[in-house]
Amino acid sequence: AGTSIIDKSIIDNYTQAGIQVGAGNTTISNSTIASSTRGISVSGNSNLTLNNNTFANNIIAADIYATVNFTHSNNTSESGTVRGFRIWGDIIRNTLWTPDNMPYIVSGYLNVSAGNTLTIKPGAIIKFAHFQSMLNVSGTLNVEGEKENKVYFTSLKDDEVAGDTNGNSNATLPAKNDWLSILLNPGATANIDNAIIKYGGYTQYYTYYGAINNKGNLNLTNSELTKNGAYGIYQLAGRSNIDKTIISEHYLGIVLSTGSSFLTVHNSSIFNNISHGIVNLSPNIIDATNNWWGDNSGPTTPSNLGGKGQSIYGNILYDPWIGKTSPNRAPILS
């Protein structure tokens, strides 16, 4: 415990962690942390501040347990194989994630416990380390992206955002099912605005289906779900309100599975999903009016003769649709 301040230092060549912290307050600034298995390793109910540091040639740049109260700015990782802030475990307080030159890397389950809120600010990049990595929400998730500064949820193998985080150039490429899901448990709330969610959706169990699996309350706006596994959104319970969002390149775009679920989707683009854009297996009606289905003729469904757009299945309101009386276009996301 206590307070440690490290400034203008070089810490290198440690077999385990260059800096290891289990409690207290630690501030590291203007330093180089290099050539160690883990540049830093911080756990427990600690307070950690990282500003203006360079991580170089560590296997893992920074290993940070989710219980740590962590703030940071202007840090870089020049080499190594896990070039970000690797985070896992239980978020036990209201937590703020902000952008940096290094992404957050979720490894395993990251749990937002009931009564706590994880807020993610514009420009933050979250990469998931492997197919058993997920964001497991029992409290509240607020994603506050902006039109020109979105929040990304993507694969560790995705070099298009935040660069080559796993340090292997093009040896691995991102693909569907690289990570699990954003799971909303009963009583959880997610307000997701201006986010890109891709390459997730891995699961062997229906309780985790979808890049977003909703048993709580989901408000999804101005976002894009694309290139995830079998399902973009799989809803088992609760409510979803979706607006101005692209849902494409899944096997099924949206699935509403039970009678305890309610879902609306408007002003969105639902297209290029392999089987159906929306499947409603519940007795409730899905209000999916004023959406773009990939063609002026509207969705493909028996009640819409001549419809050539994305197919839908079940009790779904789809008329009017974008393109019915206007030029062939997708909605503008704002």
Regions found by a protein language model. Give the residues of each.
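Beta-strand/loop edge motif enriched in small/polar residues
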Residues: 1-330
